[in-house]
Amino acid sequence: MAEQTKVKTLEKVVIRFSGDSGDGMQLTGTIFSNLSAVFGNEISTFPDYPAEVRAPQGTLSGVSGFQVHLGSRKIFTPGDKADVLVAMNPAALKVNVKHLKPNAIVLIDTDSFKKSDLDKALFTTDDPFTELGLTGVQVVAAPISTMVKDGLVEFGLDNKSALRCKNMFALGLVCWLFERPLEEAMHMLQNKFAKKPVIAQANIKALTDGYNYGNNIHASVSTYRIESKKAEPGFYTDVNGNKATSYGLIAAAEKAGLQLFLGSYPITPATDILHELSKRKDLGVITVQAEDEIAGICTSIGASFAGCLAATSTSGPGLALKSEAIGLAVIAELPLVIIDVQRGGPSTGLPTKSEQTDLMQALYGRNGESPAVVMAASTPTDCFDAAFWAGKLAVEHMTPVILLTDAFIANGSSAWRIPEMDKYPEIKPNYVANYQDEKVWKAYRRNKESLVRYWAIPGTEGFAHRLGGLEKDY
């Protein structure tokens, strides 16, 4: 084994993984981000994939990417231009040339840079780097596809299945370049493919082969070390905004002593909240995938009336459809958390792109005088606190709360220190059992100190009542 010539220490680096939509760049970037978070680096990530139906393989329209910014100090954004680009084909190189620093490192699969591949990406010469003016970049080239197929013969996989592992070979190269141990990545792959052990072992073999290839063949290339950030002791993980939002709602329900209910309809980029909470039946979470946006929020209003911490998740188009039901929650004075993960454009717009343009809709997009609390999260990790406080405000003030995030925050991830729950305040519902007044109780009787309507859970003896959308005089 040849010795490495030198190791350079960096404070931060931006890495961009890019290839066809089927090349597994999202998984590759996610695993490397998790490795970096476990290692103790600060991270910020941004998955970038087309809004259109999957384009033909190897074309410019079909390029998918994942960018991670990591460092030994506080990282606030996924970064602008990349120090390292993993380009699985010529289209990925061409699409991302504008995102590259002049002296960047580019890792390529030479098997995917043949003339037919260059033609698909609309190159006019057989030298894409010169054609793009990338004379200052350092190229780390490897016949990834060939090596993966040869290395996985023992597993008896067909050609297509074997090539699906080439992203792990590329990940192994990046792990070698940044001195990342492979054990945690192997563990992640075993969990990812727990029901397909042969696929798990094939991916682990490709990962190891990529690392060894870099270590043995490219020994003249400098490797890089990014020290772990000196951080507060505790347990850390890599979390995206949708997952943090889900955990924040669970924490709020726990602090309130309530069961969490989510009634939702799948919509990009909010669907992962429904997916995440549906996994937590062990914590008593109830999820309903309704037939449409209106049904989703109406099931949540019913659950709130029945005594749950109720929530619904959506994006801009869905928030428009839910507006009348939000008005129902306002007039009924029921606690409800509405999560709007904002996306681009009016109408269907750009489902996979990010905007922050729903504020006016959240504030004023309902008929009549229909006030509601509106909050916004600022980072993926901030989504936990924002969701917790949204739940607290909704329950303690008997009101709908709209929590705004966006696709950038929801899909991007950061290193997150898992908080101790004893540092969060209790959530105290204004139950009707606390009602003390000479007047006969009616549905809109209020706590004299807070002016909050009492919450009468169905089944509470002596407090049978009805609520609806018609204005009442009591």
PLM feature spans:
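Active-site cofactor/cluster-binding pocket
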Residues: M1-A256
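Thiamine diphosphate
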Residues: K12-L100, Y247, L260-F261, T268-Y364, ...
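A glycine-rich phosphate-binding loop feature that marks nucleotide/adenosyl-phosphate handling sites
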Residues: Y49-P50, L189, A206, E227-K230, ...
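Conserved thiamine diphosphate
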Residues: G79, L134-V137, A141-S145, K353-I402, ...
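Glycine-rich, charge-decorated loop segments at or immediately adjacent to ligand/cofactor-binding or catalytic sites
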Residues: S116-L122, G151, S323, P346-T352, ...
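Flexible, low-complexity linker and terminal segments
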Residues: A231, V239-G248, A256, A386, ...
